[in-house]
């Protein structure tokens, strides 16, 4: 009876070798070496070929449905869900969301991300891109302790897509300020803000150190032209000067990077967030920065850290508690500070406003002396000299010049008369 079994090239070679063993042309050991199998497997194949002919070298599962076979209806359901709900998701992220949505309901088993990627490629929902050859840069090992180094940056993006618009229906680009711990990869703090200016950054770090304590160091870039000239930027030109001073005041070491690649971890994280966070907020119906900040704190960051953070090389938290001096000067530390000269009439001009210093002050003030103007985050203005806060009042308009002015302001009124027991009287100056 003719054997009409169709064999592959490898199966045909295997059959020829086994037949050579059967007619004693070669020995079993030689056949095992040629085929790359054991002598015991050759003996089994000899029995199979004697009993079944050419079919004996064919794998018994050939042509049968795999135990891991996925029903075509499941494939169609998955692709339909991706088309309607997860149309712009990457395969891995789409698989995660499908598992969250369907695995708990036991409706059908969600395949692996590799299978979903293959299906999306076949249906045109995803196109695998070739990796570009990257410029060589040496790898920097992670810090060993949690809190040893915080990478900080901001990213302008349409985080709320077409759900957050201005009065003219234009899309609003929002800045996400974010810090990530270098040792663990955890997002330690994140806030949506209008811009990456001094007020927004100070508000961020004031909240950070209140919640977490003071890290040993903060790593950030010297701001690019794009960020400084961004349409939403307010006071970015002054940011580095103010931020360096504030970090020095509370003993946090500031490290500046001179390229985006130097802060690779946080740059890659922003790329991930511009994909994942945007879509998570879309699914959750988050439409404004206020809703987004609550979503970050309560849902997204805990879930993200649980999924993507790593175990640090050393256990322990190197964040430091705020000292009593830190707490005492907290508002002053996180204030925008500027220097101004005292005019001859003891007025001070600042941002189109005029302030009159009152006659009695906690320290002596002379004309042309330099004072420090502090703009606190609550919007109030404080004028200080030699560590003392001066007493002042906001004038309704620019003061008119007057002829007579007091020479100095002191801790008492200028027409003050010394008492009888004052040392000045005792030495004959009566």
Q: What residue spans do the PLM features occupy?
A:
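Short, Lys/Arg-enriched anionic-surface-contact patches
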Residues: 1-15, 65-73
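Mobile-element integrase/transposase regions
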Residues: 104, 118-187, 194, 198-216, ...
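Acidic/histidine-rich, metal-coordinating catalytic segments
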Residues: 209-235, 258-260
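Short, amphipathic alpha-helical "recognition" segments used to contact nucleic acids or chromatin
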Residues: 9-26, 75-85
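Basic, flexible linker segments flanking DNA-binding modules
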Residues: 54-159, 238, 317-325
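Charged alpha-helix within mobile-element recombinases
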Residues: 236, 242-313, 318-331
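C-terminal, beta-rich DNA-binding module of retroviral/retroelements integrases
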Residues: 301-430
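Short alpha-helical "recognition helix" segments of helix-turn-helix
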Residues: 29-35, 94
